[in-house]
Amino acid sequence: MDPRSTLPSIDRLLRQAEARELIAHHGRDNVVGMLRRLLQDRRMAAGRGDRAAGERAAGEGVLDECAERLAAQARPSLRPVLNLTGTVNHTNLGRALLSRRAAEAAFRAMISATNLEYDLERGTRGDRDSHVEALICRLTGAEAATVVNNNAAAVMLMLNTLALGREVVVSRGELVEIGGAFRVPDVMARAGCRLHEVGTTNRTHLRDFANAVNEDTAAFMKVHASNYAIEGFTAEVPQADLAALARRHGIPLLIDLGSGSLLDLDAFGLPPEPTARQAIRDGADAVTFSGDKLLGGPQCGIIAGSRALVDRMRANPLKRALRVDKIILAALAETLQSHGDPERARAEIPTLRLLTRPQDEIRALAERLCPPVHAALSGLAEVRVVDCLSQIGSGAQPVDLLPSAGLGFAETGAVPVSRIAQAFRDLPLPVIGRVHKGEFLLDLRCLEDETPFLAQLDRLALAGPA
Protein backbone atom coordinates (compact mmCIF):
# COMPACT_ATOMS: atom_id res chain seq x y z
CA MET A 1 0.00 0.00 0.00
CA ASP A 2 1.20 3.50 -0.83
CA PRO A 3 2.06 5.01 2.58
CA ARG A 4 0.80 8.38 1.38
CA SER A 5 -2.75 7.03 1.33
CA THR A 6 -2.63 6.40 5.07
CA LEU A 7 -1.92 10.01 6.04
CA PRO A 8 -4.69 11.37 8.29
CA SER A 9 -6.92 14.20 7.14
CA ILE A 10 -6.57 17.61 8.69
CA ASP A 11 -10.15 17.41 10.01
CA ARG A 12 -9.33 14.18 11.81
CA LEU A 13 -6.22 15.69 13.35
CA LEU A 14 -8.07 18.82 14.47
CA ARG A 15 -10.56 16.73 16.45
CA GLN A 16 -7.83 15.47 18.74
CA ALA A 17 -7.24 17.03 22.17
CA GLU A 18 -3.62 17.87 21.35
CA ALA A 19 -4.76 19.89 18.34
CA ARG A 20 -7.26 21.83 20.43
CA GLU A 21 -4.46 22.75 22.82
CA LEU A 22 -2.31 23.94 19.93
CA ILE A 23 -5.19 26.04 18.58
CA ALA A 24 -5.72 27.63 21.98
CA HIS A 25 -2.05 28.62 22.09
CA HIS A 26 -1.20 29.43 18.46
CA GLY A 27 -4.56 30.13 16.78
CA ARG A 28 -6.54 27.95 14.35
CA ASP A 29 -5.12 29.46 11.15
CA ASN A 30 -1.53 28.88 12.25
CA VAL A 31 -2.21 25.27 13.27
CA VAL A 32 -4.11 24.42 10.09
CA GLY A 33 -1.45 26.03 7.91
CA MET A 34 1.35 24.17 9.68
CA LEU A 35 -0.49 20.83 9.42
CA ARG A 36 -0.95 21.33 5.69
CA ARG A 37 2.75 22.04 5.19
CA LEU A 38 3.78 19.15 7.40
CA LEU A 39 1.54 16.63 5.63
CA GLN A 40 2.71 17.89 2.25
CA ASP A 41 6.33 17.42 3.35
CA ARG A 42 5.56 13.83 4.35
CA ARG A 43 3.80 13.08 1.07
CA MET A 44 6.75 14.41 -0.93
CA ALA A 45 9.29 12.49 1.17
CA ALA A 46 7.32 9.25 0.81
CA GLY A 47 7.04 9.82 -2.93
CA ARG A 48 10.83 10.07 -3.14
CA GLY A 49 11.12 6.67 -1.50
CA ASP A 50 12.30 7.97 1.87
CA ARG A 51 11.95 4.87 4.05
CA ALA A 52 11.71 6.79 7.31
CA ALA A 53 9.06 9.02 5.80
CA GLY A 54 7.15 5.94 4.66
CA GLU A 55 7.17 4.56 8.17
CA ARG A 56 5.86 7.88 9.48
CA ALA A 57 3.31 8.34 6.74
CA ALA A 58 0.58 6.69 8.75
CA GLY A 59 0.45 9.89 10.71
CA GLU A 60 2.40 8.95 13.79
CA GLY A 61 3.74 11.97 15.59
CA VAL A 62 2.13 14.49 13.25
CA LEU A 63 0.78 16.64 16.05
CA ASP A 64 4.02 16.37 18.03
CA GLU A 65 6.00 17.54 15.00
CA CYS A 66 3.43 20.28 14.40
CA ALA A 67 3.88 21.47 17.99
CA GLU A 68 7.66 21.55 17.57
CA ARG A 69 7.45 23.52 14.34
CA LEU A 70 4.96 25.99 15.78
CA ALA A 71 7.13 26.52 18.85
CA ALA A 72 10.16 27.18 16.64
CA GLN A 73 8.12 29.55 14.47
CA ALA A 74 6.91 31.47 17.53
CA ARG A 75 10.38 31.83 19.02
CA PRO A 76 11.49 35.48 18.77
CA SER A 77 14.29 36.17 16.33
CA LEU A 78 15.76 38.76 18.71
CA ARG A 79 16.87 36.71 21.71
CA PRO A 80 18.88 37.24 24.88
CA VAL A 81 22.43 35.86 24.78
CA LEU A 82 25.36 35.72 27.18
CA ASN A 83 28.12 37.96 25.87
CA LEU A 84 31.35 36.19 26.81
CA THR A 85 33.31 37.52 23.84
CA GLY A 86 35.42 39.84 25.96
CA THR A 87 34.07 42.88 24.10
CA VAL A 88 31.95 44.72 26.66
CA ASN A 89 30.04 46.97 24.25
CA HIS A 90 29.73 44.49 21.39
CA THR A 91 27.96 46.16 18.45
CA ASN A 92 26.63 42.88 17.06
CA LEU A 93 25.28 41.90 20.48
CA GLY A 94 23.42 45.15 21.12
CA ARG A 95 26.08 47.37 22.72
CA ALA A 96 25.37 48.79 26.18
CA LEU A 97 23.15 47.09 28.73
CA LEU A 98 20.77 49.54 30.38
CA SER A 99 20.86 50.11 34.10
CA ARG A 100 17.90 48.78 36.07
CA ARG A 101 16.68 52.34 36.67
CA ALA A 102 16.88 53.16 32.96
CA ALA A 103 15.10 49.93 31.97
CA GLU A 104 12.33 50.53 34.49
CA ALA A 105 11.88 54.10 33.26
CA ALA A 106 11.67 52.86 29.67
CA PHE A 107 9.08 50.25 30.67
CA ARG A 108 6.93 52.84 32.45
CA ALA A 109 7.01 55.03 29.36
CA MET A 110 6.10 52.08 27.14
CA ILE A 111 2.89 51.20 28.98
CA SER A 112 1.54 54.67 29.70
CA ALA A 113 0.72 57.94 28.05
CA THR A 114 3.40 60.51 28.93
CA ASN A 115 4.02 64.24 28.75
CA LEU A 116 6.45 63.65 25.87
CA GLU A 117 5.60 66.93 24.13
CA TYR A 118 3.23 68.45 26.64
CA ASP A 119 3.98 71.26 29.08
CA LEU A 120 2.14 70.29 32.27
CA GLU A 121 2.56 73.73 33.84
CA ARG A 122 1.19 75.73 30.92
CA GLY A 123 -1.11 73.11 29.45
CA THR A 124 0.39 73.66 26.00
CA ARG A 125 2.55 71.81 23.49
CA GLY A 126 6.05 71.13 24.78
CA ASP A 127 9.43 70.02 23.40
CA ARG A 128 10.58 66.43 23.79
CA ASP A 129 14.19 67.56 24.27
CA SER A 130 13.11 69.25 27.50
CA HIS A 131 13.26 65.93 29.36
CA VAL A 132 17.02 65.58 28.87
CA GLU A 133 18.41 68.94 27.75
CA ALA A 134 19.10 70.37 31.20
CA LEU A 135 20.80 67.13 32.27
CA ILE A 136 23.04 67.09 29.19
CA CYS A 137 23.95 70.75 29.65
CA ARG A 138 24.78 70.20 33.31
CA LEU A 139 27.09 67.29 32.45
CA THR A 140 28.79 68.90 29.44
CA GLY A 141 28.77 72.63 30.18
CA ALA A 142 26.93 73.31 26.91
CA GLU A 143 24.26 75.98 26.46
CA ALA A 144 21.81 73.68 24.69
CA ALA A 145 21.37 70.08 23.56
CA THR A 146 19.22 67.90 21.36
CA VAL A 147 18.94 64.14 20.78
CA VAL A 148 18.49 62.04 17.62
CA ASN A 149 18.48 58.31 16.98
CA ASN A 150 22.25 57.64 16.74
CA ASN A 151 25.56 59.45 16.46
CA ALA A 152 25.76 59.15 12.66
CA ALA A 153 22.37 60.89 12.54
CA ALA A 154 23.68 63.55 14.91
CA VAL A 155 26.65 64.23 12.63
CA MET A 156 24.41 64.31 9.57
CA LEU A 157 21.94 66.73 11.16
CA MET A 158 24.74 68.98 12.37
CA LEU A 159 26.45 69.14 8.97
CA ASN A 160 23.24 69.46 6.97
CA THR A 161 22.13 72.36 9.16
CA LEU A 162 25.39 74.26 9.37
CA ALA A 163 27.21 73.45 6.11
CA LEU A 164 24.69 72.57 3.40
CA GLY A 165 26.27 73.22 -0.01
CA ARG A 166 29.52 74.45 1.52
CA GLU A 167 32.91 73.11 2.61
CA VAL A 168 33.86 71.49 5.91
CA VAL A 169 37.58 71.27 6.67
CA VAL A 170 38.75 67.98 8.24
CA SER A 171 42.18 66.47 8.85
CA ARG A 172 42.96 63.60 6.47
CA GLY A 173 43.95 61.46 9.45
CA GLU A 174 40.44 61.75 10.90
CA LEU A 175 38.40 60.50 7.94
CA VAL A 176 37.39 57.38 9.82
CA GLU A 177 35.29 54.42 8.78
CA ILE A 178 33.04 52.92 11.43
CA GLY A 179 31.20 49.59 11.35
CA GLY A 180 29.49 48.42 8.20
CA ALA A 181 31.74 50.41 5.83
CA PHE A 182 30.09 53.63 7.06
CA ARG A 183 32.55 56.43 6.37
CA VAL A 184 32.71 60.04 7.53
CA PRO A 185 33.13 61.31 3.93
CA ASP A 186 29.97 59.41 2.95
CA VAL A 187 28.02 60.94 5.83
CA MET A 188 29.22 64.39 4.80
CA ALA A 189 28.18 63.82 1.20
CA ARG A 190 24.71 62.70 2.27
CA ALA A 191 24.48 65.74 4.52
CA GLY A 192 24.94 67.92 1.45
CA CYS A 193 28.30 69.47 2.28
CA ARG A 194 31.72 69.17 0.64
CA LEU A 195 34.73 67.65 2.31
CA HIS A 196 37.93 69.71 2.29
CA GLU A 197 40.63 67.44 3.68
CA VAL A 198 43.91 68.88 4.92
CA GLY A 199 47.21 67.59 6.24
CA THR A 200 48.45 64.04 5.87
CA THR A 201 47.41 60.72 7.34
CA ASN A 202 49.84 60.98 10.25
CA ARG A 203 50.47 64.72 10.63
CA THR A 204 48.19 67.73 10.43
CA HIS A 205 49.09 71.23 11.65
CA LEU A 206 47.14 74.36 12.52
CA ARG A 207 48.50 76.08 9.43
CA ASP A 208 46.85 73.40 7.27
CA PHE A 209 43.45 74.53 8.54
CA ALA A 210 44.35 78.20 8.24
CA ASN A 211 45.45 77.79 4.63
CA ALA A 212 42.23 75.94 3.76
CA VAL A 213 39.86 78.75 4.75
CA ASN A 214 38.04 80.41 1.87
CA GLU A 215 34.74 82.17 1.27
CA ASP A 216 33.01 78.79 0.95
CA THR A 217 34.24 77.39 4.28
CA ALA A 218 31.31 76.61 6.58
CA ALA A 219 33.11 74.94 9.50
CA PHE A 220 36.14 73.16 10.88
CA MET A 221 35.45 69.61 11.99
CA LYS A 222 37.42 67.35 14.29
CA VAL A 223 36.62 63.62 14.38
CA HIS A 224 37.86 61.52 17.28
CA ALA A 225 39.60 58.49 15.79
CA SER A 226 38.16 56.16 18.40
CA ASN A 227 38.41 52.85 16.53
CA TYR A 228 42.07 52.98 15.50
CA ALA A 229 45.33 54.61 16.56
CA ILE A 230 48.21 56.13 14.63
CA GLU A 231 51.52 55.93 16.48
CA GLY A 232 55.04 57.13 15.80
CA PHE A 233 55.74 60.30 13.81
CA THR A 234 52.38 62.01 14.33
CA ALA A 235 50.89 65.43 14.98
CA GLU A 236 47.34 66.65 15.43
CA VAL A 237 45.88 70.04 16.17
CA PRO A 238 44.70 70.55 19.78
CA GLN A 239 41.00 71.32 20.11
CA ALA A 240 41.59 74.64 21.85
CA ASP A 241 43.94 75.88 19.12
CA LEU A 242 41.52 74.86 16.39
CA ALA A 243 38.65 76.56 18.23
CA ALA A 244 40.62 79.80 18.48
CA LEU A 245 41.39 79.72 14.75
CA ALA A 246 37.74 79.04 13.96
CA ARG A 247 36.67 82.03 16.04
CA ARG A 248 39.11 84.31 14.24
CA HIS A 249 37.52 83.32 10.94
CA GLY A 250 33.96 83.48 12.25
CA ILE A 251 33.17 79.81 11.63
CA PRO A 252 32.14 77.08 14.08
CA LEU A 253 34.27 74.19 15.31
CA LEU A 254 32.31 70.92 15.20
CA ILE A 255 33.59 67.86 17.06
CA ASP A 256 32.42 64.28 16.61
CA LEU A 257 33.53 62.34 19.69
CA GLY A 258 32.08 59.04 18.47
CA SER A 259 31.90 56.87 21.59
CA GLY A 260 32.27 59.93 23.76
CA SER A 261 32.28 60.02 27.54
CA LEU A 262 30.78 62.17 30.25
CA LEU A 263 33.24 61.00 32.90
CA ASP A 264 37.01 61.05 33.27
CA LEU A 265 37.61 57.34 32.75
CA ASP A 266 41.19 57.48 33.99
CA ALA A 267 39.76 58.13 37.47
CA PHE A 268 38.43 54.56 37.30
CA GLY A 269 41.73 53.14 36.10
CA LEU A 270 40.50 52.96 32.50
CA PRO A 271 42.19 54.34 29.39
CA PRO A 272 41.28 58.04 29.05
CA GLU A 273 38.70 59.03 26.46
CA PRO A 274 37.88 62.61 25.36
CA THR A 275 34.92 64.03 27.24
CA ALA A 276 32.18 66.27 25.92
CA ARG A 277 32.80 68.71 28.77
CA GLN A 278 36.45 69.15 27.78
CA ALA A 279 35.49 69.69 24.14
CA ILE A 280 33.02 72.42 25.14
CA ARG A 281 35.58 73.94 27.51
CA ASP A 282 38.15 74.00 24.70
CA GLY A 283 35.77 76.05 22.57
CA ALA A 284 33.81 73.59 20.43
CA ASP A 285 30.59 75.11 19.14
CA ALA A 286 28.85 71.73 18.76
CA VAL A 287 29.81 68.24 19.93
CA THR A 288 28.21 64.91 19.01
CA PHE A 289 28.53 61.54 20.76
CA SER A 290 26.70 58.25 21.21
CA GLY A 291 24.33 57.31 23.99
CA ASP A 292 24.85 53.54 23.88
CA LYS A 293 28.62 53.27 24.08
CA LEU A 294 30.67 54.66 26.97
CA LEU A 295 27.62 56.54 28.23
CA GLY A 296 25.99 53.15 28.87
CA GLY A 297 22.50 54.21 27.82
CA PRO A 298 20.07 53.58 24.96
CA GLN A 299 20.99 53.99 21.30
CA CYS A 300 20.86 57.68 20.43
CA GLY A 301 23.05 60.52 19.23
CA ILE A 302 23.54 63.55 21.46
CA ILE A 303 24.37 67.03 20.17
CA ALA A 304 25.54 69.59 22.72
CA GLY A 305 26.70 73.10 21.96
CA SER A 306 25.78 76.73 21.61
CA ARG A 307 22.13 77.73 21.88
CA ALA A 308 22.16 79.41 18.47
CA LEU A 309 23.47 76.35 16.62
CA VAL A 310 21.32 73.81 18.45
CA ASP A 311 18.20 75.90 17.79
CA ARG A 312 19.04 75.88 14.08
CA MET A 313 19.36 72.09 14.15
CA ARG A 314 15.99 71.74 15.88
CA ALA A 315 14.42 73.81 13.11
CA ASN A 316 15.81 71.52 10.39
CA PRO A 317 13.10 69.22 8.94
CA LEU A 318 15.60 66.35 9.24
CA LYS A 319 15.31 66.62 13.02
CA ARG A 320 11.78 65.25 12.93
CA ALA A 321 12.88 62.33 10.75
CA LEU A 322 15.71 61.53 13.15
CA ARG A 323 14.04 62.19 16.49
CA VAL A 324 13.84 59.65 19.32
CA ASP A 325 10.71 58.38 21.04
CA LYS A 326 9.53 58.47 24.64
CA ILE A 327 11.15 55.10 25.44
CA ILE A 328 14.63 56.28 24.48
CA LEU A 329 14.19 59.59 26.29
CA ALA A 330 13.01 57.89 29.48
CA ALA A 331 16.01 55.55 29.52
CA LEU A 332 18.43 58.31 28.58
CA ALA A 333 17.19 60.63 31.33
CA GLU A 334 17.82 57.99 34.01
CA THR A 335 21.24 57.18 32.56
CA LEU A 336 22.18 60.86 32.64
CA GLN A 337 20.95 61.15 36.24
CA SER A 338 23.32 58.35 37.20
CA HIS A 339 26.22 60.20 35.55
CA GLY A 340 25.68 63.11 37.92
CA ASP A 341 27.84 61.26 40.45
CA PRO A 342 30.79 59.19 39.16
CA GLU A 343 30.60 56.53 41.88
CA ARG A 344 26.86 56.18 41.41
CA ALA A 345 27.42 55.85 37.68
CA ARG A 346 29.95 53.05 38.18
CA ALA A 347 27.60 51.21 40.55
CA GLU A 348 24.43 51.56 38.47
CA ILE A 349 25.51 51.53 34.82
CA PRO A 350 26.48 48.03 33.64
CA THR A 351 28.98 49.25 31.05
CA LEU A 352 31.05 51.14 33.63
CA ARG A 353 30.65 48.40 36.23
CA LEU A 354 31.87 45.71 33.83
CA LEU A 355 34.75 47.79 32.48
CA THR A 356 36.06 48.37 36.01
CA ARG A 357 35.59 44.79 37.22
CA PRO A 358 38.84 43.54 38.85
CA GLN A 359 40.68 40.69 37.16
CA ASP A 360 40.95 38.80 40.48
CA GLU A 361 37.16 38.73 40.77
CA ILE A 362 36.79 37.44 37.22
CA ARG A 363 39.49 34.79 37.74
CA ALA A 364 37.74 33.56 40.90
CA LEU A 365 34.55 33.15 38.86
CA ALA A 366 36.46 31.17 36.22
CA GLU A 367 37.85 28.85 38.89
CA ARG A 368 34.33 28.20 40.22
CA LEU A 369 32.93 27.47 36.78
CA CYS A 370 35.74 25.29 35.46
CA PRO A 371 34.83 22.03 37.32
CA PRO A 372 31.12 21.92 36.31
CA VAL A 373 31.97 22.88 32.73
CA HIS A 374 34.63 20.15 32.62
CA ALA A 375 32.06 17.62 33.85
CA ALA A 376 29.54 18.73 31.21
CA LEU A 377 32.10 18.19 28.44
CA SER A 378 32.46 14.48 29.35
CA GLY A 379 36.09 14.47 28.31
CA LEU A 380 35.33 15.51 24.73
CA ALA A 381 37.31 18.74 25.12
CA GLU A 382 39.85 20.15 27.54
CA VAL A 383 38.91 23.22 29.58
CA ARG A 384 41.17 25.36 31.75
CA VAL A 385 41.21 28.72 33.50
CA VAL A 386 43.06 31.29 31.40
CA ASP A 387 44.05 34.92 31.69
CA CYS A 388 42.90 36.99 28.72
CA LEU A 389 42.31 40.56 27.57
CA SER A 390 38.96 42.31 27.21
CA GLN A 391 38.21 45.40 25.16
CA ILE A 392 35.70 48.21 25.51
CA GLY A 393 34.19 47.74 22.06
CA SER A 394 32.02 49.88 19.77
CA GLY A 395 35.10 51.65 18.47
CA ALA A 396 36.38 52.88 21.82
CA GLN A 397 40.07 52.53 22.73
CA PRO A 398 41.00 49.71 20.31
CA VAL A 399 44.61 49.59 21.49
CA ASP A 400 44.11 49.65 25.27
CA LEU A 401 42.98 46.25 26.56
CA LEU A 402 41.71 45.23 30.00
CA PRO A 403 43.22 42.29 31.95
CA SER A 404 40.53 39.62 32.37
CA ALA A 405 40.08 35.87 32.85
CA GLY A 406 37.93 33.10 31.47
CA LEU A 407 37.72 29.52 30.28
CA GLY A 408 39.78 28.20 27.39
CA PHE A 409 38.67 25.12 25.44
CA ALA A 410 41.22 23.13 23.47
CA GLU A 411 40.65 20.31 21.00
CA THR A 412 41.38 16.76 22.16
CA GLY A 413 40.91 15.27 18.72
CA ALA A 414 37.36 14.26 19.54
CA VAL A 415 35.65 17.59 18.94
CA PRO A 416 36.96 20.55 16.88
CA VAL A 417 36.94 24.04 18.36
CA SER A 418 34.28 25.16 15.87
CA ARG A 419 31.89 22.51 17.19
CA ILE A 420 32.51 23.56 20.79
CA ALA A 421 31.64 27.15 19.85
CA GLN A 422 28.51 25.96 18.04
CA ALA A 423 27.42 23.85 21.02
CA PHE A 424 27.51 26.89 23.29
CA ARG A 425 25.60 28.97 20.72
CA ASP A 426 22.95 26.22 20.52
CA LEU A 427 22.10 26.42 24.23
CA PRO A 428 18.62 27.75 25.19
CA LEU A 429 20.35 30.93 26.34
CA PRO A 430 23.07 31.13 23.66
CA VAL A 431 26.59 31.66 24.97
CA ILE A 432 28.77 33.69 22.60
CA GLY A 433 32.54 33.43 22.95
CA ARG A 434 35.44 33.84 20.56
CA VAL A 435 38.14 31.70 18.99
CA HIS A 436 41.63 32.90 19.92
CA LYS A 437 44.90 31.22 18.94
CA GLY A 438 43.22 27.92 18.20
CA GLU A 439 41.20 27.83 21.42
CA PHE A 440 37.56 28.62 22.08
CA LEU A 441 37.54 31.29 24.77
CA LEU A 442 34.81 32.42 27.14
CA ASP A 443 35.90 35.74 28.68
CA LEU A 444 33.87 35.99 31.91
CA ARG A 445 34.11 39.77 32.41
CA CYS A 446 30.46 40.26 31.43
CA LEU A 447 29.06 37.27 33.38
CA GLU A 448 27.74 38.80 36.60
CA ASP A 449 25.14 36.12 37.35
CA GLU A 450 26.49 32.61 36.80
CA THR A 451 23.20 30.85 37.63
CA PRO A 452 21.68 30.87 34.10
CA PHE A 453 25.00 29.71 32.66
CA LEU A 454 25.28 26.76 35.06
CA ALA A 455 21.60 25.82 34.80
CA GLN A 456 21.88 24.88 31.14
CA LEU A 457 25.20 23.02 31.08
CA ASP A 458 23.34 19.70 30.99
CA ARG A 459 21.96 20.80 27.61
CA LEU A 460 25.43 21.14 26.12
CA ALA A 461 25.31 18.81 23.11
CA LEU A 462 28.77 17.73 22.06
CA ALA A 463 29.63 14.72 19.96
CA GLY A 464 32.70 13.36 18.26
CA PRO A 465 33.47 13.88 14.58
CA ALA A 466 30.59 12.99 12.29
UniProtKB/Swiss-Prot annotation:
Its required cofactor(s), as named, are: pyridoxal 5'-phosphate
Where in the cell does this protein reside?
A: Cytoplasm
Keywords on record: Cytoplasm, Protein biosynthesis, Pyridoxal phosphate, Selenium, Transferase
What's this protein's family per the entry? Answer: Belongs to the SelA family.
Tagged with keyword Metal-binding: no
Top-level EC class, please?
A: transferase
Q: Gene encoding this polypeptide?
A: selA
Tell me the InterPro entries matching this sequence. PyrdxlP-dep_Trfase (IPR015424), PyrdxlP-dep_Trfase_major (IPR015421), SelA-like (IPR018319), SelA_trans (IPR004534), SelA_trans_N_dom (IPR025862)
Give the record's GO CC terms. cytoplasm
Pathway the protein contributes to: Aminoacyl-tRNA biosynthesis; selenocysteinyl-tRNA(Sec) biosynthesis; selenocysteinyl-tRNA(Sec) from L-seryl-tRNA(Sec) (bacterial route): step 1/1
Question: Which parts of the sequence carry N6-(pyridoxal phosphate)lysine?
Answer: 293
Q: What is its main location?
A: cytoplasm
What are the GO MF terms of this UniProt record?
A: L-seryl-tRNA(Sec) selenium transferase activity
- Extract the HAMAP family matched here: SelA
Swiss-Prot/TrEMBL catalytic activity: L-seryl-tRNA(Sec) + selenophosphate + H(+) = L-selenocysteinyl-tRNA(Sec) + phosphate
Q: Does the keyword Disulfide bond apply?
A: no
Q: Which organism is it from?
A: Paracoccus denitrificans (strain Pd 1222)
Single GO BP term? conversion of seryl-tRNAsec to selenocys-tRNAsec
Q: What is this protein called?
A: L-seryl-tRNA(Sec) selenium transferase
This molecule's function is given as: Converts seryl-tRNA(Sec) to selenocysteinyl-tRNA(Sec) required for selenoprotein biosynthesis.
Q: What Enzyme Commission number(s) does the record list for this chain? A: 2.9.1.1
